[in-house]
Amino acid sequence: MSHGEETELLLDPKEERFVLLPIKYHDIWKMYKKAESSFWTVEEVSLDKDIDDWGKLNAKERHFISYVLAFFAASDGIVNLNLVERFSTEVKVLEARFFYGFQMAIENIHSEMYSLLIDTYIRDNDEKNFLFDAIRTIPSVKEKADWAIRWIEDKNSDFATRLVAFACVEGIFFSGAFASIFWLKKRGLMPGLTFSNELISRDEGLHCEFACLLHYHLKKKCNRIKEVVMDAVEIEKKFLSESLPVNLIGMNCNLMCRYIEFVADRLLENLGEERVYNATNPFDFMENISLVGKTNFFDKRESQYQKAFVGIENGNDSFRIDVDF
């Protein structure tokens, strides 16, 4: 912890405690209960129809989905590495540690889901192993992974800056790929893939909101928010318009770039900054499914995955980041 971080309550060893009650940070605790109510397992996702649908896709579509899944499978492990090695040890507030502990379990489920999807769709073992090792074998995936790992290994940047960086990993690096899978849903294809995408995108939206909430609690905010966000945006735009262009599945690359800018603007506002891109959402099918600022799109347990009675409590919200734009 740097000298400037010594006064941060979130990082202050004096805040460390082993008994939960009484709750001290009610907004952080409420976010944990929201995550807890959204627990799911891979056994709830049926892939039976996906196997038939996979054969209906053309070679470009299969290539695109395979590479997106390869990125996702690697990225959840990277997020967990950061939680284990950095955030969960740096943050001393117990309510936040509860959230991080639960997030690690959820990221494990995501990783299991993506690995299972690859294992189900890809029959050739060499291709399967190539995809499982994507951060070494696929340059475009490696570039995104390297960006995230750089922040884990960074010993000079303060907690606030690294918090923003991982909000970008979960809020921006995932956004375009999530949208591309929802695009397939419009065609009525791959119901297992698209359902798991709904579950995972909601989880990641909540994780991104949590990062914004912790940043809100910091006395010393990150002074490089726009720089970090814009850097992530450029990497993501390159990934989905050049390295793995979405036109492989019939999407418009320019519209995808605008969508990434739209998501970035919302993240910036949730971090207390002005918009940079002033982008509108070009995808009507993503209106109610956005990673940042809207996590209330789950109304059915084919999407209805909130556990009964979990998270019901009295009290007012002290922090809101669900503003509609």
Swiss-Prot record:
Keywords in alphabetical order: Deoxyribonucleotide synthesis, Iron, Metal-binding, Oxidoreductase
Co-factor binding comment: Binds 2 iron ions per subunit.
InterPro entries: Ferritin-like_SF, RNR-like, RNR_small, RNR_small_AS, RNR_small_fam
Organism: Encephalitozoon cuniculi (strain GB-M1)
Names of required cofactors: Fe cation
One Pfam family of this chain: Ribonuc_red_sm
Protein name, per record: Ribonucleoside-diphosphate reductase small chain
Binding locations of Fe cation 2: 107, 170, 204, 207
Active site positions, chain numbering: 114
GO biological process, one term: deoxyribonucleotide biosynthetic process
Function: Provides the precursors necessary for DNA synthesis. Catalyzes the biosynthesis of deoxyribonucleotides from the corresponding ribonucleotides.
Single Gene Ontology MF annotation: metal ion binding
Family per similarity comment: Belongs to the ribonucleoside diphosphate reductase small chain family.
Residues annotated to bind Fe cation 1: 76, 107, 110
